[in-house]
A protein has these predicted regions:
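Amphipathic alpha-helical coiled-coil/heptad-repeat segments
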Residues: 1-9, 131-175
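Residues within well-ordered alpha-helical secondary structure of globular protein domains
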Residues: 17, 103, 144-147
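Generic alpha-helical structural context detector
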Residues: 12-16, 98-102, 171
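A short beta-sheet element
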Residues: 38-104, 113-114, 121-125
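Non-catalytic DNA-recognition/assembly elements of restriction-modification systems
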Residues: 1-22, 26-38, 127, 132-135, ...
Length: 175
């Protein structure tokens, strides 16, 4: 997102950054109403309660994928290795913020410290710089990026289906 003009702000100045609450992995299930996000890219399991509303950005705090940026459409349990970005100020289009953070995901991942169980400290996430254009521009960018993401997801689904069809036809051909 080079070339975006606006004000440089710290992430912690435009959203509340809240670390999740750890729950014992022994009480997680393989299915349930709410997924549990911890330090990974995929859910750690499922739980009967949620502690974070849907339509929330999360950033993985610990583990090999710390710094991974995700948009959670549904309510979820934010675990002890997960930062949730809440209560965005009125000057922020939340979808624009998500796309901006996703674009800078490698930079966020570079904030990790430690080698055994790497993590990203809250102070580093709080001070992460964001270029914030006017709210109207944010909304325009977000609309374009949402449309592109939607189309990319469809294209990926089509590619996966073509791959399945190809494998099926290859099996039929060589039976």
């Amino acid at each position: 997102m080079t070339g975006v003009r606006g004000n440089s702000v710290r992430l912690g100045d435009i959203v509340q950054i809240q670390k999740g609450k750890q729950i014992n992995s022994e009480i997680l299930s393989s299915a349930g109403p709410y997924y549990v996000m911890n330090g990974g890219i995929t859910p750690s399991g499922y739980y009967s309660q949620f502690n974070t509303e849907g339509n929330t950005i999360s950033i993985s705090e610990g583990g090999n994928s710390c710094g991974y940026v995700q948009f959670n459409e549904k309510p979820y349990w934010s675990g002890g290795h997960c930062y949730s970005l809440l209560n965005a100020r009125p000057i922020v289009d939340y979808r624009f913020l998500f796309h901006t953070l996703k674009y800078h995901q490698d930079d966020i991942m570079a904030l990790r410290i430690g080698s055994g169980l790497p993590n990203i400290q809250k102070k580093d996430i709080v001070s992460f710089p964001i270029m914030l254009p006017s709210l109207d521009e944010q909304r325009r960018f977000a609309s374009v990026f949402d449309t592109l993401s939607f189309r990319l997801n469809i294209a990926e689904q089509v590619r996966v289906n073509y791959e399945k069809q190809k494998k099926y036809l290859m099996r039929c051909m060589f039976i």
